[in-house]
């Protein structure tokens, strides 16, 4: 066999191998695709209640190459963290702070996600005499008038902002009064604040989800006032603005947001906690005009 014939045969064999190999290439699977990380910062309550982790897990199950990581902090601290540019999406519950965040160009828009409500809690013997009242402003006035021990988070969290709104509506400035205590560890969240209030047999304003998740551990306090519209607690999404915060993953955040407001995610919210606590911890609020 001469060299030219040998070379031709070799070329033909390589061509056949190339064709066969091309037919055997498998489609990329989850382990070979690039991974995307979405970073969010959330108000503490929905994280501690398990709601945010449940939503994250459901989304990551559908999108195995997406990793969602979260920080938790009070709304004020969450917003401050987002301004540093390390957060793609915030989940918060203080309308005035949210609107300012967007107005300052750090967030693109406020998007309703879910809601629950706040309640006024206090000791069983109720020295302020507010049990059964449905007017939160009138109830908190009675606490102040009788100089009864009241515990505040005092950290500009959404819970603290709501509390301040109620005091303002009542025409009362509680700071500086001996009966008004700012819990020194309030920034750690509603759970620790509620348990401290229980130890002190005092009054406080608390979100219902925290109450339900901690109810079994409470010895001295319970819900005394509920049902006032002023106590509604709207939890909203704000994507961070890529024009101001250039390192944020806006597309990834918006893909997650679009799923969070979908029927699938809203159904998860609707049923979360129902089996364990006998009632849901949060209610769906996507596409609502009230938030």
Regions found by a protein language model. Name each.
Residues 16-19, 82, 248:
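Structural motif
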Residues 105-106, 110-125, 136, 228-233:
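Short Pro/Gly-enriched coil loops immediately N-terminal to beta-strands
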Residues 79-94, 98-113:
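Short beta-strand-centered segments that line the small-molecule binding cleft or hinge
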Residues 24-62, 67, 76, 95, ...:
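Exported/periplasmic ABC-transporter solute-binding proteins
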């Amino acid at each position: 066999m001469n060299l030219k014939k040998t070379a031709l045969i070799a070329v033909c064999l390589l061509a056949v191998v190339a064709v066969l190999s091309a037919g055997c290439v498998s489609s990329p699977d989850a382990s070979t695709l690039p991974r995307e990380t979405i970073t969010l910062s959330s108000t503490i309550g929905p994280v501690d209640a398990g709601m945010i982790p449940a939503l994250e897990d459901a989304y990551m199950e559908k999108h195995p190459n997406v990793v969602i990581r979260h920080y938790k902090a009070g709304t004020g601290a969450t917003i401050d963290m987002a301004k540093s540019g390390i957060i793609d999406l915030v989940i918060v519950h203080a309308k005035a702070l949210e609107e300012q965040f967007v107005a300052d160009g750090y967030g693109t828009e406020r998007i309703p996600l879910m809601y629950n409500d706040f309640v006024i809690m206090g000791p069983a013997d109720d020295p302020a005499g507010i049990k059964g009242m449905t007017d939160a402003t009138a109830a908190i006035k009675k606490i102040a008038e009788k100089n009864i021990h009241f515990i505040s988070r005092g950290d500009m969290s959404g819970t603290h902002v709501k509390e301040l709104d109620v005091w303002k509506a009542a025409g009362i400035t509680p700071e500086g009064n001996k009966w008004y205590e700012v819990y020194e560890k309030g920034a750690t969240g509603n759970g620790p604040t509620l348990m401290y209030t229980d130890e002190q047999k005092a009054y406080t304003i608390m979100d219902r989800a925290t109450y339900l998740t901690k109810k079994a551990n409470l010895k001295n306090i319970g819900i005394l006032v509920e049902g006032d519209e002023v106590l509604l607690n709207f939890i909203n999404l704000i994507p961070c603005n890529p024009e101001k915060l250039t390192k944020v993953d806006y597309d990834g955040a918006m893909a997650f947001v679009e799923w969070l407001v979908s029927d699938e995610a809203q159904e998860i919210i609707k049923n979360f906690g129902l089996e364990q606590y006998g009632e849901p911890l949060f209610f769906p609020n996507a596409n609502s005009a009230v938030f």
